[in-house]
């Protein structure tokens, strides 16, 4: 098992980043790839969790150990796989997540992609009281980009689709942000907050 990787960030896509270490490029699935935009071609440390399947070895990466801890707690719940856990971590509202679990707020938990009533109830059952202290929000850097606003919005929509949100949900998000100019990272953060409000 890997704990973390330290290397040069060489590539960002809507679903993953690539970190080169010792001549190898590691494809790492992350919650919001564009939150790493400010680190392209720089040395980064990414906290890792490895998932070994019959057909693939997958790496999931996190900015902080707190993010990784939330992810590990989520995948311990029956019905939550790594992709769904990553989508929950992407919302970057760990305090809201912990409060919803501790207060049995099933409706809030059901706003996450692929979380139905049964899984939300299981989250409460398995995780209530497991977070001793609410993890801090990661507050990723608000880096600006020279790319056009629509290109950034397209990248954000692609990343949200990868997290499991539907085209119907994202059509409303696109309409809401049309004409604005933000980085893909900021679009993703703002869109996730809107999606959680319902």
Curated annotation (Swiss-Prot):
It comes from the Bacteria. Residues 1-63 are annotated as: Domain I. One of its GO terms (cellular component) is cytoplasm. The keyword Cytoplasm applies. GO terms for biological process: DNA recombination; DNA repair. Residues 143-147 are annotated as: Flexible linker. SUPFAM superfamilies: DNA helicase RuvA subunit, C-terminal domain, Nucleic acid-binding proteins, RuvA domain 2-like. Keywords: Cytoplasm, DNA damage, DNA recombination, DNA repair, DNA-binding. Pfam families: HHH_5 (PF14520), RuvA_C (PF07499), RuvA_N (PF01330). Residues 148-198 are annotated as: Domain III. It is found in: Cytoplasm. Its main location: cytoplasm. One of its GO terms (molecular function) is four-way junction DNA binding. Residues 64-142 are annotated as: Domain II. Homotetramer. Forms an RuvA(8)-RuvB(12)-Holliday junction (HJ) complex. HJ DNA is sandwiched between 2 RuvA tetramers; dsDNA enters through RuvA and exits via RuvB. An RuvB hexamer assembles on each DNA strand where it exits the tetramer. Each RuvB hexamer is contacted by two RuvA subunits (via domain III) on 2 adjacent RuvB subunits; this complex drives branch migration. In the full resolvosome a probable DNA-RuvA(4)-RuvB(12)-RuvC(2) complex forms which resolves the HJ. Has three domains with a flexible linker between the domains II and III and assumes an 'L' shape. Domain III is highly mobile and contacts RuvB. NCBIfam families: ruvA. The RuvA-RuvB-RuvC complex processes Holliday junction (HJ) DNA during genetic recombination and DNA repair, while the RuvA-RuvB complex plays an important role in the rescue of blocked DNA replication forks via replication fork reversal (RFR). RuvA specifically binds to HJ cruciform DNA, conferring on it an open structure. The RuvB hexamer acts as an ATP-dependent pump, pulling dsDNA into and through the RuvAB complex. HJ branch migration allows RuvC to scan DNA until it finds its consensus sequence, where it cleaves and resolves the cruciform DNA. Belongs to the RuvA family. This is Holliday junction branch migration complex subunit RuvA. It comes from Streptococcus pyogenes serotype M49 (strain NZ131). The gene is ruvA.
């Amino acid at each position: 098992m890997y704990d973390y990787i330290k290397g040069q960030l060489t590539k960002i896509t809507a679903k993953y980043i690539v970190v080169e270490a010792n001549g190898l490029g590691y494809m790492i699935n992350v919650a919001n790839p564009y939150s790493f935009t400010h680190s392209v071609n720089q040395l980064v440390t990414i906290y890792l969790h490895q998932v070994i399947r019959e057909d693939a070895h997958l790496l999931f990466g996190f900015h902080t150990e707190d993010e990784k801890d939330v992810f590990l707690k989520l995948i311990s719940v029956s019905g939550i796989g790594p992709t769904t856990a990553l989508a929950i971590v992407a919302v970057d509202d760990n305090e809201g997540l912990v409060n919803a679990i501790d207060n049995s707020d099933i409706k809030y938990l059901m706003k996450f992609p692929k979380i139905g009533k049964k899984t939300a109830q299981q989250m409460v059952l398995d995780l209530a009281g497991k977070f001793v202290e609410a993890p801090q929000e990661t507050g990723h850097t608000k880096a600006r980009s020279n790319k056009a606003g629509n290109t950034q919005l397209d990248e954000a929509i692609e990343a949200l689709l990868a997290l499991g949100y539907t085209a119907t949900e994202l059509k409303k998000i696109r309409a809401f942000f049309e004409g604005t100019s933000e980085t893909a990272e900021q679009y993703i953060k703002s869109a996730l907050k809107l999606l959680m409000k319902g």
